[in-house]
Amino acid sequence: SDCCFDEGRRVPGRTKRAAIVSFTLMLLVAACVAALTYTVRSSSSSSNEADKDLPVLKIGVTDNDPYVYVDTTGDYAGIDIDIAREACKRAGLKPQFVDIDWNDRDRLLKNGDIDCLWCDYSPCYREDKYYWTEPYLTVTVSVVAKKTSCINSLAHLDGSKTIAVIAGSVSERRLLAGDLEISPDVQIKSYGSAELCKAALAKGYVDCWMADVQSLDRLVAQYPGVYRVFADNVMTVDLGVAFDVAYEGECVKNLNTALFDMDRDGTIERIVDNYKAGATTGGQGAES
C-alpha cells in the first residue's frame, strides 16, 4: 500500500519520521549550544615535542585586548597570554587556552572543563569565591571619553552623565558602593565585555568608559584624535589567577614561585611594556 500508516501503532509513518528528524535536530542544536560554551584553541607555541608530556593547564580566557586576543596568525596573544606561557614553562606545565563565555566561567571551572581563569581578573571582592595565586600584576584604572565631550574631570560626572563598566568588575562594584570621587548620581551602564563597552562609547550610548589604563591607552592609540583619557588614576587593582575554591594540587604553589621569579627578574614588566600603545611584539603589531 502507498498509505504511510502503521496499523499497529496507529501513528502515521510520516509523523514518526518527522518526530525522529525533529528529535535529531534537537540533539544537534543542544550539542552545538554546548560546544559554543567554550572553544579550545591550539597554541603554536605549546605544541613542540619537548612539552608534549607535560601536565596540561586548561586556562579559561575571553577576548579582552590587550590582555587576551587572537592575533593575525590566528594564535592567542596579549599580556596575560604571554605571562601565562612563561609562567607555565617555568612551572613545568603546558598551557591550553580555552575561549569561554565569561558568564559561564564558574560552571566550567566547577565541572573541570577549565582549571583556572587567567584574564585580567582581580581577587578584589572575590577573595573567598576562588582559590587564588598571589597577585602577579597591579593595574591602574582610568576613565576615557570622546575628545568632543565636555567631560574633563571626574567632577563632571553628575546625574546627567552615563559611564560604562564591565558587569561584575571591580569598577562596577566601587561605583555602586559610592566610594570613589564620583557623584553617586552618575548613571552606570554595565556590559558583558570590554568590546561591548567600546561599542557603547563609540555609538554614544554612554559618555565615558571606566577600565584599566592599558585597555584605554590601546583604544586611544587605535583611534587617533577620537578619544582621550581624562582621569589617569581612579584606583589600582591587583590581578591574580583564579582556581576553583575546592582545588587541591601543586599548580598554585608552582605558579606562585614562577610568577614571583618573573616579577623579580623583570619578565612581567617587559611583557607589559611590549603591549603598551604603539609597541610591537615579535615583529608584529599587537593588534586585536
Describe the predicted segments one by one.
Residues 32-43, 97, 170-192, 223-224, ...:
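Ligand-binding clefts/hinges and TM-proximal coupling segments of bilobed small-molecule sensing domains
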Residues 1-96, 267-288:
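N-terminal hydrophobic or amphipathic helices and topogenic motifs
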Residues 81-90, 148-151, 155-171, 241-281:
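Extended ligand-binding regions for polar small-molecule ligands
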Residues 58, 62-66, 74-89, 121, ...:
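Bilobed "Venus flytrap"/periplasmic-binding protein-like clamshell domains
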Residues 58, 111, 115-116, 207-208, ...:
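Short, Asp-centered acidic motifs that coordinate Mg2+ and/or phosphate
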Residues 62-63, 126, 137-145, 213, ...:
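Periplasmic-binding protein-like
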Residues 66-71, 126, 173, 250:
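Short, solvent-exposed loop/turn elements at domain surfaces
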Residues 41, 81, 85, 89, ...:
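Acidic, polar ligand-binding/catalytic clefts
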